[in-house]
Amino acid sequence: GLPTQTVQYTGTDVDDLNQFLQNNTGKIVQLTQDIQVYKNTNGSFGIIMVPSDTILDGNGHRLVMKAGYTEAPDVGVVLYVYKDGVIPSTNCGVKNLSTDIPYVNSINVFSADNILIENNTLNNATKSGIMISDEYGSTVNGIIRGNTINNVGDDAIAVYGNHSNLLIDSNRISGAKGFAGIAISCLQNGQQIRVDNETTGPHDIIVTGNVVSGCSGEALYCIGSYKTYITYNTLRDSILEGVCLDSGCIGNYFAHNEVVNNGIAGGLPG
């Protein structure tokens, strides 16, 4: 299961934090001050890599750009250690962390089992605040809860691929400019495919208690998903529909949601 023992990291440097995380696998690593990040020439430096059996607890602190650097790393936090090459990651997560840095994705999950992404504030990503992608396989058994995501260039929470047993709960999203505030999609690596040829897709996902507002696409968009349970969400003020269950959606459940002042056009924006 997830780790329970806490150890504090007292530094500020992102590369030093990565080494500390690897030295303290099996623990909750709690920050005591903001972390300074930057993009090195090889591209991987500046990305926080959380190993398996480890949680990064921001403890209310932030990721900020290091003085003298202007280019952000591609990603803020990944639940993966590049040099280990172990997929899927297991029993890991990130919580209580904030950033306004314009990453491509603020938090990226490639393939993982039993993850926690909780109480983070993620603003200004050029793509997604939280991206669960399928380049290396599926993610199962995850909690995405209590995050605040604003002003992203694509989907605020993106679940792309054959992922399952996820709880997307009590997140607050505004100003997403992509498909939707929350997108649950069988599109492989974000690419358009023929949904009627697909035999896999995101499934057994609960979307509950979220507030999604002011999006350029739909508030909630599903394509090729099955057994998605959508309850007690507030979906409002989006340019397109409040909710779109698009091609290939089977056996989804939608009840007790408040859908207010959205557009009537549907499908993909643009």
Language model segments and positions:
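Acidic Gly/Asp/Thr-rich repetitive segments characteristic of extracellular carbohydrate-active
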Residues: 1-32, 37
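Extracellular beta-strand-rich solenoid/capping regions of secreted or surface-exposed proteins
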Residues: 22-24, 36-55, 64-95, 101-113, ...
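Solenoid scaffold repeats with emphasis on beta-solenoid/beta-helix
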Residues: 29, 35, 48, 54-56, ...
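Short glycine/acidic-rich loop motifs that flank beta-strands on beta-rich extracellular proteins
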Residues: 39-45, 65-71, 102-109, 126-132, ...
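Intrinsically disordered, low-complexity Ser/Thr- and acidic-rich flexible linkers and loops
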Residues: 85-86, 135-137, 186-201, 265-268
